[in-house]
Design a protein with these regions (language model features):
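Conserved loop->alpha-helix
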Residues: 1-191
């Protein structure tokens, strides 16, 4: 389990095709030393298992189903990704509970600069709309955010300078796809 408070950005160093899926090699920078073999890491919102380590590089096996349901299939060498380590007992929960089980993909339809901040509007997959609520929580590429506004087809989040700097969300452009995980409480309340 995660909190949606990204520790930093990594970079896809290599993407190796295999018979069933892909091996992602991520340069996790200095964060790699904190990660153990077999650990779960949230990579741009997707919970993945570290299958190998080599210096600053972490290796992850990604199954075809994950590639199909997330944006990971479109990530190539040089692409930056958000990284978060698992929540441990006693850690501060600064965001909200994020599981790394992506509910679907959304598309960035508007980016507006507002002083040092940005307002980003995202159109989620239609089946996700019922789980998004104004002032509710949502994870976008693994980042815990508050929904600033919502209509039937899209929602907007406000990004402060710290989030823009520390995560890949500062690099978002119109037309880009993002991983979305709706808040578990919202999903349970609809059920």
């Amino acid at each position: 389990m995660f909190t949606g408070i990204v520790i930093g950005k990594g970079e896809v160093a290599e993407k190796k095709l295999k018979s069933a899926g892909v091996v992602f090699v991520i340069d996790a920078k200095h964060w790699a030393r904190k990660v153990k073999l077999g650990a779960s890491v949230c990579v741009s919102g997707v919970c993945l298992t570290v299958t190998r380590k080599k210096g600053r590089k972490l290796f992850f096996d990604v199954m075809p189903e994950t590639l199909k349901k997330t944006t990971l299939g479109g990530k190539n060498s040089g692409t930056r990704v958000n990284l978060e380590l698992t929540l441990k007992a006693g850690d501060e929960i600064g965001g909200h509970f994020v599981y790394g089980h992506v509910d679907g993909v959304g598309e960035v339809i508007r980016v507006v600069e507002q002083g040092d901040n940005k307002l980003v509007t995202i159109r989620p997959a239609p089946e996700l709309s019922r789980f998004i609520a104004p002032q509710g929580s949502v994870a976008v590429d693994g980042v815990s955010l508050t929904v600033a506004s919502f209509d039937r087809e899209s929602f907007t989040v406000s990004l402060i300078p710290y989030t823009l700097e520390q995560t890949t969300l500062g690099e978002l452009k119109v037309g880009e796809k993002v991983n979305i995980e709706a808040d578990m409480l919202a999903k349970l309340s609809v059920k």
